[in-house]
Amino acid sequence: MTIRYPNGHAYRAPAKKIGSQFSSTNTNYGKRGMTLEEELNESNTYYEVNGVAVVHKKPTPIRIVKVDYPKRSAAVIKEAYFSTASTTDYNGVYRGHYLDFDAKETRNTTSFPLQNFHQHQIDHMRACTTQGGICFAIIKFVTRQEIYLYRAQDLFTFWDAQQQGGRKSIPYATIAQDGIQIPAELQLPVPYLKAVDQLLS
């Protein structure tokens, strides 16, 4: 099936790397083959099953253009478009607070490129924070195997500076200093709600 962006360009999903099912005891993240999105989805399932929070990945709105019906009981989508630009990846409720956040990965070791975000995502997070929502980015430095919660307000500072000709990335050292590191736990690949607790305290 071909899925296209509103500008007509074909969507190509990033290749997934398959990690070894075995990990050494010194590794912080045992499930190395999992993407950040998969890790978050697993964590959110744990949170919901245990009555801790209700957080879901937002569906991406798609407009179907062409469908084939090889059998009466089966339809095959052959062509579709992203109908609108997506906002952030996840939203939900925790301890009476609205959460809205995006998940990003980078293989850079010294900085996080701001090009990973889009203006409509920043605008959406600004609107949510204005209404009292808790917005942030969960950033994974893949090579370092480190994950951080980075507040939207801090992200806005770098985004606005970039718009004025400033640097086009956030230094790793800044994220490590101002963000909240999220170490993996036995049952939770990304126990980010502990970091949210720090924002709420």
From Swiss-Prot:
Swiss-Prot/TrEMBL site (Transition state stabilizer) positions: 104
Cofactor(s) the record lists: Mg(2+)
Catalytic activity: Endonucleolytic cleavage at a junction such as a reciprocal single-stranded crossover between two homologous DNA duplexes (Holliday junction)
Pfam entry (one): RecU
Source species, domain of life: Bacteria
EC class: hydrolase
UniProt protein name: Holliday junction resolvase RecU
